[in-house]
Amino acid sequence: MSLSLWQQCLARLQDELPATEFSMWIRPLQAELSDNTLALYAPNRFVLDWVRDKYLNNINGLLNTFCGADAPQLRFEVGTKPVTQTLKTPVHNVVAPTQTTTAQPQRVAPAARSGWDNVPAPAEPTYRSNVNVKHTFDNFVEGKSNQLARAAARQVADNPGGAYNPLFLYGGTGLGKTHLLHAVGNGIMARKPNAKVVYMHSERFVQDMVKALQNNAIEEFKRYYRSVDALLIDDIQFFANKERSQEEFFHTFNALLEGNQQIILTSDRYPKEINGVEDRLKSRFGWGLTVAIEPPELETRVAILMKKADENDIRLPGEVAFFIAKRLRSNVRELEGALNRVIANANFTGRAITIDFVREALRDLLALQEKLVTIDNIQKTVAEYYKIKIADLLSKRRSRSVARPRQMAMALAKELTNHSLPEIGDAFGGRDHTTVLHACRKIEQLREESHDIKEDFSNLIRTLSS
C-alpha cells in the first residue's frame, strides 16, 4: 500500500469540494498510514468532529475506490502525527501560495517594543483591545448563509496564527462580520487572557498612522502594530486610494505573518474586487482563507428575531417573527432595528405584539421594502448583470445563457418579494408555478455546488437590497 494514498485522496477531494471547504477542513489534516490503518490528525476537536460528520463518507469512498478490498481503516485523532513519519507531502496544487516572494521587514526584538502614542514611550506598550465583550460565538445566530464563516472564525479563535492566516471575511453591510471579529477576539483572550488582541476599523489605523507622522513617532507606531498577537481590522476597503496607509499596512502585514501572529480582515466585497487597493495587498489578502457571508435565509432571519426577543425578555409569537423575516431580507442590522421599533411601540402603547400591530408599527419600512424590490426591478437587474435583454427572460429560449439567468431571476423573486409562485410564473412569460419551483430548487442546488453561482446570487441580492 503506497504512502501516496492520502495524496491521491487530497487531489480527488480538491476536485470534488468547493475551494473554501477544502482549505478550511481538509488541508489542515495530517495523515499517517500504518498496519492497514489510515490515521488522520486534526488540529483540534472542532475540526475532527466536523470532518468526521461531513466528509467521512467521501474519504471512505475514495479509499475503497483506490484500494478496493484492501482499503485501510480510518482513525481520527486530535493533534499532529509523530515526527518520525514523513507522510504529509501534499499534492503540489493543494499547497497554499508561497509567502516568500517579497522581502519582509525585520521583526523588532521584544525588549525594544514601545507604545507609539507616548513619547518617550514605555518599554511595553499599552494595548487598546477595543474588543466588545458582548459579541461572542454563543450569541451569534448560525445559518447556512454564515455557517462557514462562523466555523472559520471559531477555528482561528482556537488556533490563532495557524492555517487560516489571514482570515478574510466579506459580505454586505450588517451581516455579522464585525460580530465575528469581536467573537474571535473574545475567544482568543478567553484561552489566553494576556494575549495582545487589537480590534479596529481601518480608518482608525489610518488616523493612528497620521498621528504618528505628525508626532515624529512612526517607528513606535510600527512596533506597536507589529507586536500584537492578533490584529482584527474591519472594513479594509477604506484603505482604497490611501497610498501611504497601504504601504505601511503592507509591511505590517508581512511582519505579522512572518511572526505567526493572526490577521483577520473584513470587507464588503471579494478581495480582488476592492478598487483602489494595490494588487500586492489584494494578493496577500487571499493567502490564507477567504469566506463569504451571505444575507441570511428565511429560517435564520426568524431565528435571529426570536433570539433577539428572548434577550430582551419579550415573547415574540412565531407567526410574527415569520411575518417580519419574510418582508425584511437584506441584513441582520435591519432586522434587529425593526424588532427594536416593534418592542418600543409595544412598550409605549401597552399593546400585544401581533401581526396587525407589527404591520402598523413598521408600515413605512414595509412600504419602502415593497417599493424597492419588484419583479420588474429584479428582471431589469438580472438582465443587466448577465448582459442579456429582459425579453430573453420572458421568452421561450432554453439555451443556458438565457435559462440560467431566468432561473436566477425567478429564485430572487421568490426570495425578495411576497408574490406567489403562480404570480412569479405569470410575470416570466406565463410560465407554470412548477417551473418556478424547479428554478428555485435548481439555483439553491447550484449555490451549494458552484462558487460562481453563489457569488452571482450574493451580488444580485446586495444590489437589489441596497
Curated annotation (Swiss-Prot):
BP terms from Gene Ontology: DNA replication initiation; regulation of DNA replication
Residues binding ATP: 174, 176-178
UniProt region (Domain IV, binds dsDNA), positions on chain: 347-466
Residue ranges of the region described as Domain III, AAA+ region: 130-346
InterPro entries for the chain: AAA+_ATPase (IPR003593), Chromosome_initiator_DnaA (IPR001957), Chromosome_initiator_DnaA-like (IPR020591), Chromosome_initiator_DnaA_CS (IPR018312), DnaA_C (IPR013159), DnaA_dom (IPR013317), DnaA_N_dom (IPR024633), DnaA_N_sf (IPR038454)
Protein's cellular compartments: Cytoplasm
Keywords, sorted A to Z: ATP-binding, Cytoplasm, DNA replication, DNA-binding, Lipid-binding, Nucleotide-binding
Family matches, as Pfam families: Bac_DnaA, Bac_DnaA_C, DnaA_N
HAMAP family: DnaA_bact
Annotated domain remarks: Domain I is involved in oligomerization and binding regulators, domain II is flexibile and of varying length in different bacteria, domain III forms the AAA+ region, while domain IV binds dsDNA.
PANTHER family the record matches: CHROMOSOMAL REPLICATION INITIATOR PROTEIN DNAA
The protein's name: Chromosomal replication initiator protein DnaA
Source species of the chain: Salmonella enteritidis PT4 (strain P125109)
Taxonomic lineage of the native organism: Bacteria, Pseudomonadati, Pseudomonadota, Gammaproteobacteria, Enterobacterales
Gene: dnaA
